[in-house]
Amino acid sequence: MASLDVLIVGLGSTHGLRAAEDELAGSLLRAGADAMLVRAERPREVRTLALTDLMWARAARRAAVESLAEAAPRAVVYSTTTAALLWPQPGAVRFDAPAAGNRPGRHGVWQRPVERRRLREAPLLVPQDAGALVEAGSPTTESVIVPIPVEPSDGGAGGVRDIAALTYATNPYKKGLDRVLAAWEAVRREDEELVVAGLRGPDRPGVRYAGTLDHDDYRALLRRARVYVTAPRREDYGIAQLEALADGTRVVTTPAPGPYAALPLLAGVGAEDGAPVGWVADPSPAALGAAVRAALDDATDDAVYADRALAAIAPFRRAAVDRTVAEELLPRLLRP
């Protein structure tokens, strides 16, 4: 049986999750670990969230069992609490948000109690943000916070900003597209256009739907946008907001429940100069619209803003995350 330092059992159910799993595996490899990432096979689609999670948990268990039969890892990391629900053996749990927060009522009827047990039994928790621990009930299990790394995209900031505003709305209700559209209608000027990525819809004056995009094409749009605006009803991390900052795009957002890792940074909480790099407003059309207008009319030079934004996201850059993985996470994973 082959030896292995770390086995990561991932779901890979979304692009964002696959990217986060790849980043964790890459950080472990750069830290000198012999790490392997395996993913669950996508199950057939079912109608309810509770059954969907069961199908994914069973698929993750199968992937773990098959890999454990071939290798003897010193540590196992389950990527998401769903992957850990039916684990064949205990391991560290990597998660952005617990079912306690994003599976209310009947949607999490079986997941929440099993999740609480797994978070108690795990040797280590690896949340992406401290807010995820709070939402999980502040379990006493040892934890290491490891953010998702964010870097400027190829091309970076500095190009032509010929799109006034961009929003991402693959889940329009959760992302608050209705709020964004109402605010946009209240403040847009005749020559300004909002591009809606991740969704198809009827174009109208001032609003254009870009549909589903691959990630490189989306980041290319982001580099062209002056403002990224979002009004989420719940936010489990805020990776799109961090990517916007990485590409020098001004960010407008509303507060939202959930472990919204990007929100304190956007609001200037903890900043040395106390200055926010984003515009945070209530979701009413008047308040959100005023924030969008202020961001669009911001007189700060684009290059100066891009430098400030990059400095603000320093804790989320790959080099910082690699240090955390090498100095804090890996020693705890491999501790006898």
Q: How would you describe each model-predicted region?
A:
Residues 233:
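Aromatic "clamp/platform" in nucleotide-sugar-dependent glycosyltransferases that forms part
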Residues 77, 82, 86-106:
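Active-site proximal beta-strand in glycosyltransferases
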Residues 54, 58, 283, 287, ...:
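A charged, aromatic-enriched C-terminal amphipathic alpha-helix characteristic of glycosyltransferases
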Residues 131, 149:
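Carbohydrate-associated surface elements
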Residues 150, 156-175, 181-186, 194-195:
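Conserved donor-binding/catalytic core segment of Leloir-type glycosyltransferases
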Residues 250-254, 260:
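Short hydrophobic beta-strand element within catalytic cores of glycosyltransferases
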Residues 106-128:
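Membrane-proximal helix-turn-helix segments that form the acceptor-binding/catalytic region
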